[in-house]
Design a protein with these regions (language model features):
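Aromatic-rich, lipid-facing transmembrane alpha helices and their immediate juxtamembrane interface loops
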Residues: 1-171
Length: 171
């Protein structure tokens, strides 16, 4: 089991928590959307991204008890959001695909996590000191970015170029 420590809020042995780094990802996304005037175009029907985020979150918890569908979720992010361009201003307008943006951010989160574990700032139970975290953690960060991103878009909808009238209402 990946969570040997005692916890106050637990479902089937998996702690429910939102740690500093997890909350920071959502805060970072909200902030850079505003700072760099980011637009996401074309954006798929909003409800589909909500379903994807829910599936990712459920897999984070359930993969300890049922088959892990992470590879399917990776593919779903590319299929659903592969055409979505992240358009931002940094002197002039630039853009690249949303999955590439998520991959870049997940790499830097993984790097920060490794720096934290190598310096002893953060440790995992059962891991030796100064242990390098696996690339699987980068995959987890990649998926977490979509959960955080969709959570932010529940509040900040303006940057999304949604072409679907059935999108979840803002109220």
């Amino acid at each position: 089991m990946g969570y040997p420590e005692a916890s106050v809020l637990v479902i089937m042995g998996v702690p429910l928590f939102s740690g500093f780094m997890y909350a920071s990802v959502g805060s970072y996304i909200a902030r850079v959307i505003r700072i760099f005037d980011i637009r996401f175009t074309p954006y798929p029907p909003f409800w589909t991204t909500v379903v994807l985020a829910i599936a990712i979150y459920v897999n984070f918890v359930a993969h300890h008890f049922v088959p892990d569908i992470r590879l399917i979720l990776f593919a779903a992010t590319v299929i659903l959001l592969g055409r979505t361009m992240v358009r931002f201003t940094l002197g002039r307008r630039y853009g690249f695909p949303l999955p590439l943006a998520a991959l870049i951010v997940s790499f830097f989160l993984w790097l920060a996590e490794n720096i934290s574990t190598l310096t002893g700032t953060w440790t995992y139970a059962g891991s030796p000191p100064f242990d390098w975290t696996s690339l699987q953690k980068m995959g987890s960060w990649y998926l977490l970015i979509y959960v955080a991103f969709v959570t932010v878009t529940l509040v900040i909808r303006a940057p999304l170029d949604i072409k679907d009238n059935r999108a979840i209402s803002k109220s």
